[in-house]
Amino acid sequence: MGKTFLAQKLMEKLHYPYLSLDHLKMMFIRGRLTDLTVEDDYEMRYFLWPYATELIKTAIENEQNMIVEGCYIPSEWREQFTEEYLKDIRCFFITMSEDYLRKNFDSVKSNGSVIENRMEEEVDLERLINCSKEFKKEAEENNIPVIDITDHYDINEIIEKALKIISL
């Protein structure tokens, strides 16, 4: 959904490093540190999150900025942090409407590796639609701002929306 591309653009604009949770996932899979596979998205979310949480806490303790991106951020992410940390964290989700995905599936699929060279994996339209709907629902239930792509994908517009959400 353009998460890594957005993180890359924000890194270039803000000069903040970013952590792709996909990279963390692949470290565990390739290092045989988990039996989970690239298809185990839901389980992977809860496997990775404790590690990501500690990385985020360490960055905050060292007064360092960091962008964390990926679909492995659980909607109840706040539960892992005390107020001391929460005051320094900004979070938003990116979703794509069903209509947008159906009309632009080929483009979404072909641009999925614009930043990362990914292993060949079959992109499933219905899975993308369901994941996007679920993320949007979870975000609404947990008061997480959403950037919902509904009619066109303009990275500059998305960057501006992201900067407003994080108040920079």
Task: Report each predicted region and the residues it spans.
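Glycine-rich phosphate-binding loop used to anchor ATP phosphates in small-molecule kinases
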Residues: E43-F93
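ATP-binding Walker
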Residues: M1
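A glycine- and Lys/Arg-enriched "phosphate-lid" helix/loop adjacent to the NTP-binding pocket
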Residues: D88-E134
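NTP-dependent small-molecule kinase module
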Residues: K133-L168
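Conserved substrate/cofactor phosphate-moiety recognition/catalytic segment
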Residues: Q8-Y51
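Conserved nucleotide-binding/hydrolysis micro-motifs of P-loop NTPases
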Residues: L24-M26, I73-P74, M96-R102, Y153
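Conserved beta-strand scaffold positions in the cores of enzyme catalytic domains, especially
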Residues: Y18, D88-F93, V146-D148
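Walker A/P-loop
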Residues: T4
